[in-house]
Amino acid sequence: MTSYTFTRELRLLTPAQFKSVFSNPIKASSAEITLLAIPNSEQHPRLGLTVAKRYVKRANQRNRIKRVIRDSFRLNQHDIPHLDIVVLVRNGVMEMENAEINKLIEKLWRKLSRRYNG
C-alpha cells in the first residue's frame, strides 16, 4: 500500500542541504511561488520551505501557506522525481485562498517534473 506520510526523511533539515539546492537548481516558478530543485541520491524527494516575514507578516498566515504546500507535497510525493526541492514564497501569496495555492503548487510540481525528465 502506498504511504502518504510526511516523515523526517522527506524533509531538508540542515543549512548545508538547503545551500546545496541553491547552488545550481532546476527552477519552476510563478509570480508568487518558486521551486528550486537538484537531483538527490535518495529514493524519494525531499522538501524544504521558506516563507519570509518580509512577504507574509503574520505567523498564522506563514503557517497556513506552509501547511498547504506540505500537504500537496505529501499527496504528490510519489509523482515527483527524486529531487531535493526548496519552495520560496514571494509577495502576493498571502491574498490567495488555500485551494488557489494548492492548484498553483500542483501545477509547479508537474512543471518541475517535466523540466527534470525532459
UniProtKB/Swiss-Prot annotation:
InterPro entries for this protein: Ribosomal_Su5_D2-typ_SF (IPR020568), Ribsml_uS5_D2-typ_fold_subgr (IPR014721), RNase_P (IPR000100), RNase_P_CS (IPR020539)
Recorded superkingdom: Bacteria
Protein name: Ribonuclease P protein component
Any one Pfam family match given in the protein's UniProt record, by short name: Ribonuclease_P
Main function: RNaseP catalyzes the removal of the 5'-leader sequence from pre-tRNA to produce the mature 5'-terminus. It can also cleave other RNA substrates such as 4.5S RNA. The protein component plays an auxiliary but essential role in vivo by binding to the 5'-leader sequence and broadening the substrate specificity of the ribozyme.
Record PROSITE patterns: RIBONUCLEASE_P (PS00648)
Family according to the record: Belongs to the RnpA family.
Keywords, in A-Z order: Endonuclease, Hydrolase, Nuclease, RNA-binding, tRNA processing
Gene from which this protein is expressed: rnpA
GO cellular component, as recorded: ribonuclease P complex
EC number annotated for this UniProt entry: 3.1.26.5
Quaternary structure and partners: Consists of a catalytic RNA component (M1 or rnpB) and a protein subunit.
Catalytic activity line of the entry: Endonucleolytic cleavage of RNA, removing 5'-extranucleotides from tRNA precursor
GO molecular function, one term: 3'-tRNA processing endoribonuclease activity
One GO biological process term: tRNA 5'-leader removal
